[in-house]
Structures are given as C-alpha cells and as structure tokens.
Amino acid sequence: MNEIRNIESDPIYRNRLANMLVDRILKNGKKSLAYQIFYQAMKRIRQKTNRNPLSVLRQAVRGVTPDVVTETKRVGGSTYRVPIEVVPAKGKALAIRWLLIACRKRSGRSMALRLSDELIDAARNSGSAIRKKEETHKVAEANKAFAHFR
C-alpha cells in the first residue's frame, strides 16, 4: 500500500505547509533557489499586507482548496466525469499546485513577486487559483447526476 511520506518543516518558519510549497516551487533540483524565492515572497507579503505571511499563506491555501473534484470513469463505452469529495491531504496538494500554476502564468517580473501577488490575491478570495477552484466546483455540480458511478 502507498505510504504517506513524512513532510519536514522548513528551516526558518518551521512550517510543513511552507515546505510543501517550496518542494513544488523546486525545479531541476535547485532547492536553495526555491527557498530563496519563497522567503522573498514571504518578506514581500509582510511588507504589502502588514500581516504574518504564514497566516496569509494558510488563508490562501484554505481558500483555494477544493471540496470536490471530478474523476473520469468509463462505463459501458461512455465516459463520465464523476464528482468525488477530496481528501484533505489531496486538497491541500491540489491547492498548492493550482497556486503555483497561476503564479507561473502571471506576466513578467520575478517568481517571488508573482508568488507573493498570487498568495495575497488568493487570501483575498480573488485571482486565477480561486477561479480554478470555482470552475472545478461548477464542473462537479454539473456532473452531480453521475455521482452514483463512484
């Protein structure tokens, strides 16, 4: 059976959620660069909002975490999008993935600036990641009739 890997906490904030985000920022094994981007984004969040950046991060992830997603099921030659409730760990992972996809799609500037802007927007219940969650919920709502295929 799949074992859930133990997630360490990051060195400065001592927070698992922060480390999950850093692990997803990571590209080509450059973890020190990923930490640098994350800490610059956190510093900018503190400057822009005058709030604890970790609380902004938690609020952003909580806001983007989906309640339901759709899974594709094939039944008798037809394909259905079946709505399924999300397990909290998977929801958090999806939220982090969507936040990073949204900030990578933002135009120009450095990754730290885009990440901080996206996290602030998500904490305020706006931004691309929030739209992705709402879109996912709409698709699940539209396919509610197929819930019995679970």
Curated annotation (Swiss-Prot):
Gene3D superfamilies attached to this UniProt entry: Ribosomal protein S7 domain (1.10.455.10)
Keywords from the UniProt entry: Chloroplast, Plastid, Ribonucleoprotein, Ribosomal protein, RNA-binding, rRNA-binding
Transmembrane listed as a keyword: no
Gene Ontology BP terms: translation
Subcellular location: Plastid, Chloroplast
Gene Ontology, cellular component aspect: chloroplast; small ribosomal subunit
Cysteine-cysteine disulfides: none
Keyword Cell inner membrane: no
Main location: plastid
Region forming the signal peptide: none
GO terms of molecular function: rRNA binding; structural constituent of ribosome
Family: Belongs to the universal ribosomal protein uS7 family.
Free-text function comment from the UniProt entry: One of the primary rRNA binding proteins, it binds directly to 16S rRNA where it nucleates assembly of the head domain of the 30S subunit.
Subunit structure: Part of the 30S ribosomal subunit.
Name recorded for this polypeptide: Small ribosomal subunit protein uS7cz/uS7cy
Species of origin: Adiantum capillus-veneris
